[in-house]
Amino acid sequence: MKKLMILGGSRYAVPVIEAAHNLGLYVITCDYLPDNIAHKFSDEYCNVSIIDKEATYEAAKRLKIDGIVSFACDPGVATAAYIAEKMGLPFQCSYRATEILQDKGLFRHFLTENGFNCPHAKRYEDKKSPFNDIDYFNWPVIVKPTDSAGSKGVTRVDRVEDLADAINVALGGAHNGAFIIEDFLTFEGYHSSTDPFTVDGQLKFATYSDQLFDPEADNPYTPAYIIWPSTMKQEHQDYLTSEIQRLMTLLNMKTGIYNIETCVANGKPYIMEVSPRGGGCKIAELQRMAYGVDLIEAEVKKAVGMPIDEIKQTECDGCWCEMVVHARPGKSGILRSVTIDSDIKEKYLKVVDLSAKPGDFVQPFTGANMSLGDMFFRFDDRTELETVMSKSNEWLHIELDEK
């Protein structure tokens, strides 16, 4: 029986475990949090810090694994690439390419050096150095950890006097002690976050989405809704698909899933993030329902060297919306219940996956890690989607008790 090691134990790993079990694989989940939910579904738990490459590598050798993934688990991606390279296991790319993709500063430098559209950006480790580069940026700017996902540690800065605080916030969310400052891009339309797939370095499946933010949330840069298909102009989608393929070729990518974020600003399409892993927010699961393409199964098969079914580009069946369920702005307390009006539930709701349960303490929506779970909705067209989702405050009820 082949062994698949999954780095991370969040609920986003559960569909990967299910796919692996359906293929007859033995699943080992790894992190340093034994109570994480995914460990209840795996065949074996390995207690190791997944950002410690050498410790995780030693565990992988001892356990004689046949494949490794860090699905929807950003901190483990570089470790997964490192172990795959050391053990000769399949992975999307080399460890060096992964280092570039996983560090926002290195990635921005790579994009700029190779002629991709890219905002002014600089990577720093010293808190004081940015104050020598104030005129380099087109203000406002955005400050981020270089190695953190889920919008953690991200702050928009409009005034120089607020920069120091934003740097401290970014460093608080960083694992490697580095942060990036870049021009704040005002999107034309919406930001896109999707999970494409390559086979032998060729982009075989790619979608674009409309990622909507809750402007009233405690962190207004954390996605609250993701909608397929995108309203992005087709010419911009075609340009981005071509540029993503160029990026894949330059980095000598192989086979696997990616989480890719793109946008259009100043009349130009931008590749913002590329990570060799499945995305959080259950993106691949929604794409499976909307497009009929199972990239989770394909990624698992790839990881352990099994033949992959042909991956084909398909069209979206209707209009789909993923809602990231979160507390109302400024609200916190003990969760009593999450309910949906019956008419909405019966007509549009397809999936409910709540991570929070009654009795849990709910905090304001400051990052993806503060979500209460996800819901998938299907509509016949975009007008119907927007009409219903714009009234979610009326039909979605999140009841909290004071702490």
Protein language model annotation of sequence segments:
Residues 1-96, 128, 306-309, 315-318, ...:
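ATP-binding N-terminal substructure of ATP-dependent carboxylate-amine bond-forming enzymes
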Residues 100-180, 200-202, 226-242, 246, ...:
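Active-site nucleotide/adenylate-binding loops and adjacent lid/helix of ATP-dependent enzymes
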Residues 155, 183, 228-229, 288, ...:
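Short, well-ordered beta-strand elements within core beta-sheets of diverse protein domains
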Residues 158-159, 325-329, 375-381:
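Short beta-strand-to-loop capping motifs
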Residues 161, 183-191, 195-253, 257, ...:
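ATP-dependent carboxylate/phosphate-activation module, predominantly the ATP-grasp catalytic core
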Residues 258, 342-360:
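A structural supersecondary motif
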Residues 307-347:
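A glycine-rich beta-turn/hairpin centered on an aromatic-Pro dipeptide
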